[in-house]
A protein has these predicted regions:
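Active-site nucleophilic cysteine motif
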Residues: 29, 33, 69-85
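A glycine-rich, coil/turn loop motif that links secondary-structure elements
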Residues: 67-71, 103-105
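Functionally constrained cores in energy, signaling, and assembly domains
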Residues: 64-69, 112-115
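Secondary-structure boundary elements
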Residues: 2-64
Length: 157
């Protein structure tokens, strides 16, 4: 869809600018995805509620609708960011694996984010809604619980 291509083009333009300032470091790629996702799909739960009030709870609404309306919540941002990383992977800019992870914490709620794993197994979290981009093993305790059950053994070492 046109909306996705526009956001991807914005990302590539930002990458060119960032490469002139910061070089080709890998972290700047993740930072660019983080920033373009936030800019292209600002977090706005109230606007999302207004946009979806006329839809039945089981109705699927396309992501490009939220991009066009410039409003999303964590799941929309995670989907867009993962799409951008997959596109970068397909075009040869990165070579790790990308997923959208989510969980629910009792009495707190659910949340979704992007997980990127490098070929050597280093895990990065990109979470525009919670304002975080960085390594899983460097996350402070006040952050969301991003670890998968199999990550816990590795993180305790």
């Amino acid at each position: 869809p046109e909306e996705f291509n526009k956001v991807y083009e914005d990302l590539l333009k930002k990458r060119q600018e960032d490469m002139q300032k910061r070089g080709k470091d890998f972290k700047s790629i993740l930072d660019s995805v983080f920033e373009i996702t936030k800019d292209g799909l600002p977090y706005d739960d109230k606007k999302v509620e207004k946009l979806t009030v006329s839809y039945n709870n089981d109705t699927k609404v396309t992501l490009n609708y939220f991009i066009r309306e410039r409003a999303g919540v964590c799941r929309h941002q995670a989907l867009l960011g993962a799409y951008l990383l997959e596109r970068l992977r397909k075009d040869g800019y990165v070579n790790g694996s990308v997923s959208v992870d989510r969980n629910e914490v009792p009495n707190v709620g659910g949340h979704a984010w992007i997980r990127y794993t490098t070929p050597n197994g280093q895990i990065f979290i990109i979470d525009p809604a919670q304002e975080y981009v960085g390594q899983l093993d460097k996350i402070g305790q006040w952050r969301w619980f991003y670890a998968r059950p199999d990550d816990l053994k590795k993180l305790k070492k």
